[in-house]
Amino acid sequence: MATPHINAEMGDFADVVLMPGDPLRAKHIAETSLEDVREVNNVRGMLGFTGTYKGRKISVMGHGMGIPSCSIYTKELITDFGVKKIIRVGSCGAVRMDVKLSDVVIGMGACTDSKVNRIRFKDHDFAAIADFDMVRNAVDAAKALGVDARVGNLFSADLFYSPDGEMFDVMEKYGVLGVEMEAAGIYGVAAEFGAKALTICTVSDHIRTHEQTTAAERQTTFNDMIKIALESVLLGDQE
């Protein structure tokens, strides 16, 4: 049954959904990576599609920017449409000097300055982590594709334009690989409602050096990330 934010019916979505922030990226993924594609959501322009990858039913849908937006969509996908696994595919900014532009980062866990998981977890700290099997499958898929993926913590920020530059020093000290805006929220939603989740990011810019990838570089590494996500789903089916 349709929700206030998703005009689909039970069965329209696959049990696994890839989720970029940008709905137009969702459309691009559907058009370039899936077969037999059909649109399953267009409410508020948050496009969602279902198709097949090597015969396996997979969906892709945008989640918007920030934890509040992605939390709404992931919650409804899980509780109203039977989705079991969510893979966020997005971009992040690097803070460590050994993390380079275009690196693929697999988010094993996610720190955050958001309070949403504390609200969920009765004002206690919740360890926002990805599902282990999904992490392992993504790592194995990356190796098979010849992509040297990094595995570690992300930082999910509430502010894109943060005034606290000193926090980047703390992130670097604690080994945070990349800064983005959604992973911790998605991991919290998945835990609360009994689903599994993973975040895979490509490094689009470096916060320290102010370097940025070109449009062509972003597209190449974005395609690598999507391939890793899709192949990891197939590996998960073999478990």
UniProtKB/Swiss-Prot annotation:
Binding positions (phosphate) = G21, R25, R44, R88, V89, G90, S91
Q: Does the keyword Cell wall biogenesis/degradation apply?
A: no
Q: Which UniProt keywords apply?
A: Glycosyltransferase, Transferase
Please give the SUPFAM superfamilies that the UniProt record associates with this protein: Purine and uridine phosphorylases
Q: Which domain of life is it from?
A: Bacteria
Q: Where is this site: Important for catalytic activity?
A: R218
Which Gene Ontology BP terms does the record give? purine nucleoside catabolic process
Protein EC: 2.4.2.1
Record-annotated active site: D205 (proton donor)
Molecular function as annotated in GO: purine-nucleoside phosphorylase activity
| Cellular component, GO, one term | cytosol
* Reaction catalyzed: a purine D-ribonucleoside + phosphate = a purine nucleobase + alpha-D-ribose 1-phosphate; a purine 2'-deoxy-D-ribonucleoside + phosphate = a purine nucleobase + 2-deoxy-alpha-D-ribose 1-phosphate
Q: Which family does it belong to?
A: Belongs to the PNP/UDP phosphorylase family.
Q: Describe its function.
A: Catalyzes the reversible phosphorolytic breakdown of the N-glycosidic bond in the beta-(deoxy)ribonucleoside molecules, with the formation of the corresponding free purine bases and pentose-1-phosphate.
Could you identify this protein by its name?
A: Purine nucleoside phosphorylase DeoD-type
